[in-house]
A protein has these predicted regions:
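Phosphate/adenylate-binding "loop-and-lid" substructures adjacent to NTP/NAD/dNTP-binding pockets
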Residues: 67-170
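Short, flexible helix-adjacent loops and helix caps
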Residues: 25-29, 65-72
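Charged, solvent-exposed faces of alpha-helical coiled-coils
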Residues: 16, 35-38, 42-56, 63, ...
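Short, charge-rich amphipathic alpha-helices with coiled-coil/heptad character
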Residues: 14-40
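TRNA-recognition modules of translation machinery and tRNA-sensing kinases, especially anticodon-binding
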Residues: 132-408
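Structural signal for well-ordered, non-membrane alpha-helices
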Residues: 21, 47, 54, 61, ...
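Short, small-residue-biased leader/transition segments that mark boundaries at the very start
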Residues: 2-9
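A residue-level signal for conserved active-site and pocket-lining positions in enzyme catalytic cores
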Residues: 13, 39, 112, 311, ...
Length: 408
């Protein structure tokens, strides 16, 4: 069949509609199985009709030759009429199949991952459960300052200059503090690659729509991302190209503007010469690039687990951060982060998740930072997650634990 790419409804949903709806309910979402099954049935029916019409057209085309060989002109003419009718019908059938396909994909793209049974139910962060903690909070005999107060007082953290350069929620780190950030990143990488079995990767920071979709950043979280378009607006480039072409033509020929057909030809040529603008997304986390290293690939079982790490800048617009704490270096638009990604067999996923969390905790233990590990509830964990641990470090200046790592 031509013109229709199929995307079947996940087998789990078709075979377990009640369990699927129960998982959505735990996420605080309405049932979707009945709607998805109905859309998929329309899609499959439309594809079947299109395939049947295509098969009949192919068969009739062969029969035309057979009829002509028998000198049965009437039969040949009738078959040719049938082929033409089928040829005219096929685009509509393919369009119906694609419409159902697009509808199915649109709905599926809005559905989060199903939480594991041990994930607690809850509406927001208040439903999270402390899993364990490590290290004792220290007492100090003096008034504590917050990180940004210390950084600014020492001349190593400059929010004002960063705001002039880029706007709010950026920072310039200077001197020993800039070196400390770099050293911490290198320390994390050395531990994870040298002791935990991860392979360091230096991935692209600008990625495509498909790459963002593959890690569930799109379409749901588009407003939380930064994107960049290459080149100028196509219309501006086309106008410039058209003006150049007209000026060149005027040197040797009549003015093409006086001839509507020639002007249209010049315009079409100018427009077709314009390079198309390409959108790329700045990664919100290196997880996006690392996970997509194996997208649409078949990985040999013997190569698993595949453990990857990267130290990269990350970019987030955090459009939904209104009303949340953005003090100092909290919820910056740009920050650096060491990412861990493991590609495993499905049956090894839970154990690998626990191991990854322990790897993240290990660097905090070596830095002697008190922390606690929280098991997120269904209403607070990420869209693509089945189970998430947040590791929260104790910040003495704020007198509270703050998230420093999220392991899903």
């Amino acid at each position: 069949m031509t013109g229709v790419q199929t995307c079947a409804l996940p087998i789990f949903i078709r075979d377990n509609p009640d369990a699927f709806d129960t998982a959505l309910k735990r996420r605080g979402l309405p049932a979707q199985a009945k709607n998805l099954l109905a859309i998929d049935e329309r899609r499959r029916a439309a594809i079947a009709k299109s395939e049947q019409a295509q098969a009949r057209r192919n068969a009739a085309s062969k029969e035309i030759g057979q009829a002509k060989a028998k000198k049965d002109e009437a039969a040949a003419q009738a078959l040719m009429a049938e082929v033409n009718e089928l040829k005219a019908t096929l685009p509509q059938l393919e369009a119906e199949a694609k419409a159902a396909e697009d509808e199915l994909n649109t709905v599926l793209a809005t559905i989060p991952n199903a939480p594991l049974a041990e994930v607690p139910e809850g509406a927001d962060e208040h439903g999270n459960v402390e899993h364990h903690r490590h290290g004792a909070k220290r007492d100090y005999a003096f008034t504590l300052k917050q990180h940004f107060e210390l950084g600014e007082a020492l001349g190593m953290m400059d929010f004002e200059t960063a705001a002039k350069i880029s706007g709010a929620r950026f920072v310039v780190l200077k001197g020993p503090l800039a070196r400390l950030e770099r050293a911490l990143g290198q320390f994390f990488l050395d531990v994870h690659t040298g002791e935990h079995g991860y392979t360091e990767v230096n991935p692209p920071l600008l990625v495509s729509d498909d790459t963002m979709f593959g890690t569930a950043q799109l379409p749901k979280f588009a407003e939380d991302q930064f994107s960049a378009l290459s080149g100028r607006e196509p219309r501006e480039v086309a106008i410039d190209a058209l003006n150049v072409a007209i000026q060149e033509a005027r040197k040797t020929d009549v003015d093409p503007i006086d001839d509507e057909a020639r002007f249209r030809s010049f315009y079409d040529s100018a427009w077709n010469s314009v390079p198309k603008q390409v959108r790329r997304w700045l990664i919100p986390t290196a997880e996006v690039s690392l996970t997509n290293l194996v997208r649409e690939q078949i990985v040999e079982e013997g190569a698993l687990p595949m453990r990857l790490t990267a130290y990269t800048p990350c970019y987030r617009s955090e459009a939904g951060a209104a009303g949340k704490d953005t003090t100092g270096m909290i919820r910056q638009h740009q920050f650096t982060k060491v990412e861990l990604v493991s590609i495993t067999r499905p049956e090894d996923s839970d154990a690998e998740h626990e191991r990854m969390t322990q790897c993240a905790e290990e660097v905090l233990k070596r830095l002697d930072l008190p922390y606690r590990t929280m098991l997120l509830c269904t209403g607070d964990m990420g869209f693509s997650s089945r189970k998430t641990y947040d590791i929260e470090v104790w910040l003495p200046g704020q007198g509270r634990y703050r998230e420093i790592s999220s392991c899903s």
